[in-house]
Amino acid sequence: MPEYIKIGRAPAVLYGEPAERAFLFVHGLCGNKEEAQRFAAVVNPLGWQVLAVELPEHNGRQDGVRLVPWEAVPELQNVRNYMKERWQTLGVRAVSLGAWLALQAFAGESVDYCLLSSPLLDMEKMICSMMAQAGISKERLRVEGEIPVPGGQTLSWRYLCWAREHSVSSISPKTSLLYGVKDEMTPRSTIDAYCRKFACSLTVAEGAAHWFHMPEEETRMSQWEREQLEK
């Protein structure tokens, strides 16, 4: 049975029987910690527990912590420290925005495995692209601080500065990426550049977009996860 706990203010759920190894699962935007149940079904039989945390402002979480990196990353660092005290071996399994946040939270650390699906890897580039589409200059954003744009999002000068100052790197020699060929969020060139720089394994899923959610896509994801751990 999953065990529901809190780590600081972060709600979390732990899957699997006691073990010496554990993955941290970090969901993406509009996701939730219970998404880790599918991943746990893959790795629990292989001797890994899975600890999944709820990102701020998700799944009814209303505790004052905001989904901005200067609040979410320190929270994940607290979770990281919690895990280091309890497990000998750690892995990271993260999705989309969760991947960007997790890579920052584990910067300077080394984990046994790092499995990233549809990862956001260059937030500065993504924000600048959104600014260009909305016709907003860096100078205007700097002066105004925050500017709402179509689609319900808000561009933030502080967020842009953070992204510029906190580029992500590798946290494991065993880093594997799963990328949908129709991903509308992250250009293939960004994925390829990261994989070349850090010698990562890349699996490209034909027909898939950024969000892997169809049954056949989830089956493909589970297969990919199992393959990485069996290498």
Question: Whereabouts are the PLM-identified features?
Answer:
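The serine-hydrolase catalytic nucleophile loop
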Residues: L29-A41, S189
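Gly/Ala-rich beta-loop-alpha elbow adjacent to hydrolase catalytic centers
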Residues: A94-A102
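Short beta-strand immediately N-terminal to the catalytic nucleophile in serine-hydrolase-like folds
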Residues: V92-A94, S117
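Active-site glycine-rich loops that stabilize anionic/oxyanionic intermediates
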Residues: E20, G28-G31, V181
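Conserved alpha/beta-hydrolase
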Residues: A40-Q62
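Catalytic nucleophile-loop/oxyanion-hole region of alpha/beta-hydrolase
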Residues: H58-K84
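N-terminal cap/lid segment of alpha/beta-hydrolase-fold proteins
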Residues: M1-E17
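The alpha/beta-hydrolase serine catalytic core
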Residues: Y4, E109-A193, K197-V204, A208-K231
